[in-house]
């Protein structure tokens, strides 16, 4: 096993070296970075050319420059990273430029990847369990459509209809009666298709979901919820109950009375602690408070499960602990919506509630309120995350469906059914785990594809992150060069001397006459 892991690690390093070499050489040969200066009539053009050639070692072939840069990368292992400098950014170190952009890109990519995996696998499993149903055909058609869509087109459509048109709707949020009816019927059809079973069961599912969704939308419209949204303790209770129902259904089933009792106690404790948590969130106004509350509620859930779990205390504790940890989501949403009025007053009127430009609002970033900043980040991340998620979601749906169908036809699944195990136990405990093995193999590839899509998405939504940095570097056609440690001091002197000779200086990436 150790030999196998070693071989894989060595192969990974070799792949990284070859890939970085190819990208570096392609970038270096994408164009002449001195082309504008060569045709310039500026009297200092030749001095500027000499300066840039000395700073970036343009007098050396790209292969030698690559190994010079690779030496700076290798120094990262001893804590002396040197990825070179970016002349386009006023000789800013590349490591600083990447550090400022990497956080926003990872935030966006991780959110899109996690949501795509969770939602895609859930939809894929339900379509596999309802094979050849109307629901299966509709989802199959939609996934093929989504998988074929170009990312830039999806991003532009979301920007138009998900932000511009939706912000116009929020100016006068009135929902026509026919829209409520159509949405209710569609949701009822989806619910009846997922539930399946006999005709009577389908009709009950269709009617209950359609009436519930239609009534909820009508209530939100009448109470003008879209003008001043809020959750409150009632919303926290409903979201917590929905989360608990999903977890119990997939984990133990509602027939497990001890699990239902333990989860019920956790829900009651969450609602009982809602008011004290208001003071905690007010005085501990920090993102770490979310982690603290999640750990606290998960610990309470595990403790309750161990107390009331009986012989199956491990399963009950796991279920109750998971429900307890997830209760932090409605609590955080409640805190964010409490800042809605302040958020609306601080954002520029031209931006709208659903933002289409940048990763945050500068006026809100300066406010020392973690919940307000979370709300601002959520409105800015919503559309880019959906744009990145929708294509990956289609892929995960298809893979999950095919994998689960293959596993469900295996002999050990038939044996489990023959022994009298329930369908939920067969699917969740035996089939689901093995069906996830092929999914795990494509996550790394999909993560790289999402990063590639982020380059385009960030440009559409004007995010100053890795995508915009990549575009900027490609357009400038300037490859950074790492420097040996003993050459840095001499290089600084050379840059000062070249500036003095040229009679100009670099200011924010622009040449200024002395």
Cite the ranges covered by each PLM segment:
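Alpha-helical transmembrane segments of integral membrane proteins
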Residues: 2, 111-125, 184-479, 483-484
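Short hydrophobic, aromatic-rich alpha-helical segments embedded in or entering the lipid bilayer
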Residues: 44-77, 461-473
């Amino acid at each position: 096993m150790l030999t196998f892991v070693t071989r894989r690690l060595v192969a990974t390093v070799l792949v990284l070296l070859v890939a970085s070499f190819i990208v570096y050489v392609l970038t270096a040969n994408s164009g002449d970075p001195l082309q504008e200066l060569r045709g310039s009539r500026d009297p200092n053009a030749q001095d500027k050319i000499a300066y840039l050639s000395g700073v970036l070692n343009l007098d050396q072939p790209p292969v030698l420059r690559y190994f010079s840069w690779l030496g700076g990368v290798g120094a990262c292992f001893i804590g002396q990273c040197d990825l070179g400098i970016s002349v386009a950014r006023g000789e800013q170190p590349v490591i600083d430029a990447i550090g400022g952009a990497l956080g926003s890109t990872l935030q966006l990519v991780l959110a899109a990847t996690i949501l795509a995996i969770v939602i895609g696998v859930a939809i894929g499993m339900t379509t596999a369990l309802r094979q050849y149903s109307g629901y299966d055909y509709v989802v199959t058609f939609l996934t093929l459509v989504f998988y074929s869509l170009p990312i830039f087109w999806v991003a532009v459509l979301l920007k138009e209809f998900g932000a511009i048109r939706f912000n116009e709707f929020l100016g006068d949020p009135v929902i026509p009666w026919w829209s409520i009816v159509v949405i209710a019927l569609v949701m009822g059809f989806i619910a009846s298709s997922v539930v399946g079973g006999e005709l009577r069961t389908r009709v009950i599912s269709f009617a209950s979901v359609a009436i519930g969704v239609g009534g909820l939308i009508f209530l939100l419209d009448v109470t003008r919820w879209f003008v001043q949204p809020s959750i409150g303790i009632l919303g926290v209770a409903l979201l917590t109950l929905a989360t608990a129902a999903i977890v119990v259904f997939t984990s133990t089933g509602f027939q497990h009375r001890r699990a239902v009792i333990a989860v019920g106690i956790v829900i009651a404790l969450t609602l009982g602690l809602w008011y004290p948590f208001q003071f905690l969130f007010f005085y501990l106004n920090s993102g770490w408070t979310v982690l603290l509350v999640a750990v606290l509620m998960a610990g309470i859930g595990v403790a309750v499960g161990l107390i009331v779990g009986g012989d199956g205390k491990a399963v009950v504790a796991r279920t109750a602990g998971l429900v307890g940890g997830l209760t932090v989501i409605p609590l955080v949403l409640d805190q964010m919506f409490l800042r809605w009025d302040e958020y609306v007053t601080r954002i520029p009127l031209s931006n709208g509630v659903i933002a289409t430009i940048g990763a945050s609002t500068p006026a809100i970033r300066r406010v020392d309120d973690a919940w307000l900043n979370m709300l601002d980040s959520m409105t800015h991340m919503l559309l880019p995350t959906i744009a990145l998620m929708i294509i990956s979601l289609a892929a995960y749906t298809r893979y999950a469906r095919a994998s689960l169908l293959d596993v469900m036809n295996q002999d050990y699944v038939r044996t489990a059914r023959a022994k009298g195990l329930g369908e939920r136990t067969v699917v969740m405990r035996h089939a689901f785990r093995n069906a996830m093995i092929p999914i795990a193999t494509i996550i790394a590839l999909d993560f790289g594809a999402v990063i590639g899509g982020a380059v385009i998405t960030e440009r559409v939504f004007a995010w100053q992150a890795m995508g915009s940095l990549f575009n900027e570097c490609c357009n400038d056609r300037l490859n950074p060069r790492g420097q040996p440690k003993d050459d840095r001091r001499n290089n600084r002197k050379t840059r000062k001397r070249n500036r003095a000779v040229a009679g100009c200086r670099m200011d924010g990436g622009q040449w200024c006459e002395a």
